[in-house]
Amino acid sequence: MIRIKYSGLIVFSSKIFSIFTGLIFIVLVTRNLSIIEFGVWQYLSLILSYVIFPAGLIPYWVTRFYARGYPVAKASIISNMIVSLPFFTFFLILAPFASTIININLSLFYLISIQIFLVYLSTSLEALALARKPHLLGFEAFAFESTKIVLALILFTILKLGLKGVIATVNLAYLMQCLTLIFFLRKELIKEEEFNYKILKKWFSSIWLPLFNALPAFIGGLDLFILAALTKSASSLAFYKVASSVAAVISYSLSTSIALYPSLLKGGERRDVEEALKFFLMFAVPMSFGAVFLAKPILHIFKSDYEKASLLLFFMAPQLFLKSLTHIFGDVIVGVEKIDEKENTSFKDFLKSKLFKWPLLNYFRNGIAIILTYIFASFALTYFSNDFSLYAAFSCLLANIIADIFLFIKGYLTSIKAVSFNFPLNKLFKYCLASAVMVIALKFLNPVKSLETIFTIAIGSIIYFLCLFSIDFESRIIFKKVFTYMKKFNLWE
């Protein structure tokens, strides 16, 4: 149980670390590239995203099998690298045609193509780490982000390499990420194990299921295309995206429950679910309160013009909170499913399983969001002539909130049938109470400038945990046990 919390705390810390390093990296990039060069990088990254999308299909099965004790470490890496070859070839064939669209030097395509192999390798290694050593996902993130910043400083400020320097930096950061995981997984990787062709055949024959599971993420983005098409303006997207970039930080709290899924695959029980929920809520609740009550000063950090998007953030924060809880319920639903343990699982068996039914609910959710976005955005454009961009963005948000409430209810009801757990309402009340005290203190500080806001957030975090530790004895014990475990834990194993 403590190991689950330890893994969650490590990965959560790496997520918070990545917020600051990501901000530094973007500042370094935008200050050292022209607007055209930055646009070229985004264009290259967009094309790359289509060929690295399949990188997660085989690892979907790897985590499930490896967590249950199957020796599939080598099969995982080899199979995913085999999958990468046709997509790497397709990218190189596509490059000459894609380069003519906005007149890009072909050498940039060849340079960024290295990422294809690195992403496929890192994804297979991450699947192995998630199955048995989830805390390694935090270590790899620290390695990736630190390498990215150090190399960016060298390649941009000293060597002045420009766009090639940006691509090389990301390539080398991915390489460091892979090397970090290989080092910590070295014992598992050098073990002699029989290459199980039966399992490999099963993965490839059932690859349609992880593909079916991943597609809702692509479909879910159509609501923003509808918004852009109806408004014929980038302003609505800008307001929506800047608010979502802040609210998305709440979802980082999900990393505290990262070890729940592999734990359930190994035969975890209701106590694992309840403890994971408590630990998630401990961080997600204050972050949600902070995003709501500090909406304007936080958005001011980006630009004063974005303060109007505080209306969106006020509703988007609780939406992301519910969405994150739904994600945990989803982990419970698919984590306890055992259908794939059978030797000869038929197509019909998978269709009857929760591995198919849960993603299917996500399709319904996205369908609701897309239809309602069209209806609400059309209404907003008809009746709100002033600030139509803001209200059109809000209509898209409202559609997604309704869709997420539907999925949250279905997810909760399905998950408690799968594992009869109790939702920790008493803990939720204590976290809300400590968060309310934090918000009152923050209102007295009343930050205006960007640095003041960052300082206020840090002060708010301290106030929250001091208040929480004073009213919740279990929280003090949890952190004490986690840090005791960290002292005893052998980092190099």
Per-region residue spans from a language model:
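Signature of the first transmembrane helix
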Residues: I2-Y60, F88-A95, Q115, I149, ...
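Helix-loop junctions and terminal segments of transmembrane helices
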Residues: I52-P71, L130, A247-L281, G330-I339
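Interhelical loop/hinge segments that connect adjacent transmembrane helices in multipass membrane
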Residues: M1, F109-Y110, H135-F139, L163-T169, ...
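Alpha-helical transmembrane segments of multi-pass membrane transport and lipid-handling proteins
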Residues: F20-L23, G56, I77-N103, L111, ...
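Membrane-interface junctions at transmembrane-helix termini in multi-pass inner-membrane proteins
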Residues: F65-Y70, L118-A141, P318-R365, I371, ...
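Hydrophobic alpha-helical transmembrane segments
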Residues: F139-K187, A247, L360-I375, F384-T414, ...
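Interfacial/gating helices of multi-pass transporter permease domains
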Residues: T21, F25-Y50, L163-K164, K202-S206, ...
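Membrane-proximal transmembrane or re-entrant/amphipathic helices at the cytosolic face
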Residues: S420-K427, L442-E493
